[in-house]
């Protein structure tokens, strides 16, 4: 596939005059194009759902979720991965972002790194990729050599391979298990895929990581009950979440949170289930961390004791 054949490299007929518009009209043009992104993502929801449903069983067996990309695509992967530990309380090694050119490429563009096919492979070798892992190759064009090299190696290892591209690429179907292709069309500025393509990638990765974490029991209702309350803002959020989940009084919430070292999930179960810390911990372990399941188990245990 040549550069001219890529949709993301096309010239946008709607923005040909953007250099002659007023600031407000220029921004309206950009905004009009941006509105197309969530609609493009909506069309690929079935593929996103398939990816989530195939990632979760692997993670339950000890697998990791790994994002691989170059340039903007790599940075977006790192951004999403880096937010998982504080948001969902997971180990920093569970969701990993890898960028062509290494960490220095996060701040400074290393454009030549994307052409390194072997680099994509080697970076996955360096993190000891296994068949339990899931690898998402992120590329606006769908043909970035670094990303293709990584996906090819992941396929060889037996890992789940997912392609997140903004162009169709039938040439990689043999190395990609799940293809996610939000087609956002030509960019406002020709070839500037940090714009619509990057936004689409961000939306999709948000959906994948959030969906996976929900299915791993990291969310109760719509509360991030495994957050790490590492500063005052997050401690305040923790108190509010326990309040919303339990309706308990402030003094009880404060006491239980202090007793659990601000473990929101444990605090909610202790209050809702009216139980001691040790029993709540045991039920959570039995329920694989799912609060709703732990509450059901408590009721079953009580029925068995009657």
Curated annotation (Swiss-Prot):
Its EC number is 4.2.1.126. Residues 55-218 form the SIS domain. Pathway: Amino-sugar metabolism; N-acetylmuramate degradation. GO terms for biological process: amino sugar catabolic process; N-acetylmuramic acid catabolic process; peptidoglycan turnover. Coiled coil: none annotated. The active site is at 83 (proton donor), 114. InterPro entries: Etherase_MurQ, Glucokinase_regulatory_CS, MURQ/GCKR, SIS_dom, SIS_dom_sf. It catalyses: N-acetyl-D-muramate 6-phosphate + H2O = N-acetyl-D-glucosamine 6-phosphate + (R)-lactate. Signal peptide: none annotated. GO terms for molecular function: carbohydrate derivative binding; carbon-oxygen lyase activity; ether hydrolase activity. A lyase-type mechanism (elimination/hydration) is suggested for the cleavage of the lactyl ether bond of MurNAc 6-phosphate, with the formation of an alpha,beta-unsaturated aldehyde intermediate with (E)-stereochemistry, followed by the syn addition of water to give product. Belongs to the GCKR-like family. MurNAc-6-P etherase subfamily. Homodimer. This is N-acetylmuramic acid 6-phosphate etherase. The gene is murQ.
């Amino acid at each position: 596939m040549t550069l001219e054949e890529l949709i993301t490299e096309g010239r946008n007929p709607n923005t040909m005059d953007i250099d002659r518009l007023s600031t407000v009209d220029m921004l309206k043009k950009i905004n009009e194009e941006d509105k197309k992104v969530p609609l493009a993502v909506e069309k690929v929801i079935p593929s996103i759902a398939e990816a989530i449903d195939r990632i979760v069983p692997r993670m339950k067996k000890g697998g990791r979720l790994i994002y691989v990309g170059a340039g903007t695509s790599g940075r977006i992967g790192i951004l999403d991965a880096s937010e998982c530990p504080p948001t969902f309380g997971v180990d920093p090694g569970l969701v990993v972002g890898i960028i062509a050119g290494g960490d220095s490429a996060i701040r400074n563009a290393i454009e030549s790194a994307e052409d390194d096919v072997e680099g994509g492979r080697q970076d996955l070798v360096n993190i000891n990729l296994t068949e339990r892992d899931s690898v998402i190759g992120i590329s606006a064009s769908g043909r970035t050599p670094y990303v293709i090299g990584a996906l090819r190696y992941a396929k060889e290892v037996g890992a789940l391979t997912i392609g997140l591209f903004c162009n169709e690429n039938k040439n990689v179907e043999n190395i990609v298990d799940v293809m996610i292709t939000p087609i956002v069309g030509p960019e406002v500025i020709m070839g500037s895929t940090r714009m619509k393509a990057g936004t689409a990638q961000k939306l999709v990765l948000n959906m994948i990581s959030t969906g996976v974490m929900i299915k791993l029991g990291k969310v109760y209702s719509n509360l991030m009950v495994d957050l790490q309350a590492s500063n005052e803002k997050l401690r305040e959020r923790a108190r509010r979440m326990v309040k919303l989940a339990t309706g308990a009084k402030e003094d009880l919430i404060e006491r239980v949170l202090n007793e659990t070292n601000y473990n929101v999930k444990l605090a909610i179960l202790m209050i809702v289930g009216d139980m001691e810390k040790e029993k709540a911990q045991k039920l959570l372990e039995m329920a694989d961390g799912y609060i709703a399941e732990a509450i059901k188990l408590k009721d079953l245990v009580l029925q068995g004791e009657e």
